[in-house]
Regions:
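Intrinsically disordered, low-complexity activation-like regions
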Residues: 1-80, 85-149
Length: 149
């Protein structure tokens, strides 16, 4: 996988910046966004599904981009099918491989999306670790990664 595509993912996903939410793109069901993501990143997702993305562990930016690709873009590209969640286990493995290296370097909404697979997993051990990381973020930075609600 071409690691230069990591910048494309981050530029697209965080087009409003790392500290400005884009909840419509991120969390609202939209056929337009789904189709746009599939057109721009569908082939890249297929490569990642073949296990070609582990070189993306080498930088914080490529780490975050690969998580977004597997966790978020899968949900957009495969929306409405069982395949929406087929990359969850591979994504969780990838998150775990880089979490200790990058968790303190994550800025703004990067943390939220690097953290999101812990919320999506059905594995209880990972859920407990995610809960711990969630509360640790509050202690370190004074707020929760998703806001203080």
């Amino acid at each position: 996988m071409d690691i230069s595509r990591a910048k494309d993912i981050l530029d697209y996903w965080f087009s409003k910046g790392l500290y400005t939410a884009d909840f419509d793109k991120w969390f609202m069901k939209s056929q337009d966004y789904d189709e746009e993501i599939k057109e721009k990143f569908g082939n890249l997702l297929k490569e990642a599904e073949q296990g070609k993305g582990f070189s993306w562990l080498h930088t914080k930016d490529s780490y975050v981009a690969h998580i977004i690709l597997l966790d978020q873009f899968s949900r957009h590209i495969y929306r409405g099918s069982g395949d929406s969640f087929k990359n969850d286990n591979g994504c969780m493995l990838f998150v775990e491989l880089g979490w200790e290296m990058y968790k303190e370097q994550l800025e703004g909404y990067e943390f939220m999306f690097a953290f999101m697979p812990y919320m999506h997993t059905e594995n209880m051990a990972y859920q407990k670790k995610g809960e711990f990381n969630f509360h640790t973020h509050k202690q370190l930075y004074g707020n929760y990664p998703l806001g203080d609600k």
